[in-house]
Amino acid sequence: MTNPQPAIEGGISEVEIISQQVDEETKSIAPVQLVNFAYRDLPLAAVDLSTAGSQLLSNLDEDYQREGSNWLKPCCGKRAAVWQVFLLSASLNSFLVACVILVVILLTLELLIDIKLLQFSSAFQFAGVIHWISLVILSVFFSETVLRIVVLGIWDYIENKIEVFDGAVIILSLAPMVASTVANGPRSPWDAISLIIMLRIWRVKRVIDAYVLPVKLEMEMVIQQYEKAKVIQDEQLERLTQICQEQGFEIRQLRAHLAQQDLDLAAEREAALQAPHVLSQPRSRFKVLEAGTWDEETAAESVVEELQPSQEATMKDDMNSYISQYYNGPSSDSGVPEPAVCMVTTAAIDIHQPNISSDLFSLDMPLKLGGNGTSATSESASRSSVTRAQSDSSQTLGSSMDCSTAREEPSSEPGPSPPPLPSQQQVEEATVQDLLSSLSEDPCPSQKALDPAPLARPSPAGSAQTSPELEHRVSLFNQKNQEGFTVFQIRPVIHFQPTVPMLEDKFRSLESKEQKLHRVPEA
């Protein structure tokens, strides 16, 4: 597999590079000149002297090297090309044809006068004038023949049979006239032999070719240019075909690789197109992601993506509402989020011992909105150990409350399932649920506690009426907790004092005090 050409800056593909090269090569093609420009192929019309002269000069050295053409020439070099174009021009050939017709007419009249078929008063004087005019015209023809031999070369002139015949006709016409004139004077019937000059009328063909050959030669030059361009295009086509074959082979390899990986491109494309519509639908506050087994590494990573809550689930971020919920249950002016599983841990509010790894006691229970408040339908206890980093950033992260939705894998450790709760303890569960919901709704209780903003404490009357009842309910819940978890001896995790404690003391009292059982070794 050949390496394709490197891509140019700007991400230009290889096909565009090749097309640009083809355009440049096409523009750089010079006008094609004729090769082996022989005398018989020269046009007889007025040709561009620059083009024809340059071609003739390029072949001039080859003409000089021929045998028998080294004799002295009066017109050589660039003048030879100019004279050659002049001798082959259409204007000269037209003039020569006209002279041939004229000399034939004059010789015919002279012959008629000499044989006395044409008689008038001054016939003999007129015949003498016609004789000298015909002799001058034949002399011009002879001079033109000599000039052709000198300019074209003797061997080129001899190779052209038509030119040899034309020269012979001129000599046979001129020689008898000169001889009769010297012997008998202008009045001699032998002048009729000069009528052989009529054979030179064939130059009419040269005049016709003078208007046809230029067009023919021009078309031949254009054809040669197109043939060269065709050769270049064929080469480019072969290169492009090879590139297409290579790319097709790579595409087949990639498709085979995707088929081995069981990747469905159509399904992925449809899923990507449906993603904006799925994200635009209203959802709960949190989104559960597939995170696999919940261990220390996945616990440290953010596997829960928070989405924007709906307007119905928006709650007031006010400490007064949290305090009122803590004592009186959920307030009427605060919204309750849709059912979700919240994991409430005691390490979320452990802001006093950031460098000590604490055992977590978590309760996973779905929250439901009931007529009198939130009611718990199921309760499962799971223990996990999370080691927090000993840094300032870890203290800040550790102080935030963990109220994220997660999927808990079933525990591999066998243990007795908790017995079903009797109906008499629903009041206790509702109380504990109120406490957990109030804690789960606060995203960052430590920051609220450190906030210097004034807090509205509950009225003494309300607190006096509520605190003993809450203390009694919490004590009952702690007893039930110890009875329910027979395997894990857990001490009460929530303690209340008879008097109304400060907010900071409440958070400190919620710290975990259970025994460190089944610790996971740190990595």
UniProtKB/Swiss-Prot annotation:
Transmembrane regions: 95-115, 122-142, 162-182, 192-212
Cytoplasmic side: 1-94, 143-161, 213-523
Keywords from the named record: Cell membrane, Cell projection, Coiled coil, Disulfide bond, Membrane, Transmembrane, Transmembrane helix
Tissue distribution: Mainly expressed in the cerebellum. Also expressed in cerebral cortex, skeletal muscle and thyroid, but at much lower levels.
Domain of life: Eukaryota
Location of this chain's protein in the cell: Cell membrane; Cell projection, Dendrite; Perikaryon
Extracellular topological intervals: 116-121, 183-191
Bias (Pro residues): 421-430
GO MF: protein homodimerization activity
Region Disordered, residue ranges: 380-477
Gene Ontology CC: cytosol; dendrite; perikaryon; plasma membrane
Membrane topology: Multi-pass membrane protein
Ranges of biased composition (kind: Low complexity): 382-397
Polar residues biased stretches: 398-411
Parts forming coiled coils: 218-270
Principal localisation: membrane
Subunit structure, interactors included: Homodimer; disulfide-linked.
General function of this protein: Voltage-sensor protein present on the post-synaptic side of glutamatergic mossy fibers and granule cells in the cerebellum. Despite the presence of a voltage-sensor segment, does not form a functional ion channel and its precise role remains unclear. Undergoes both rapid and slow structural rearrangements in response to changes in voltage. Contains a zinc-binding site that can regulate the slow conformational transition.
Record's comment describing the protein's domains: The transmembrane segment S4 functions as a voltage-sensor and is characterized by a series of positively charged amino acids at every third position. Transplantation of the transmembrane segment S4 into HVCN1, generates a functional voltage-activated proton channel.
The protein's name: Transmembrane protein 266
Organism whose genome encodes this protein: Homo sapiens
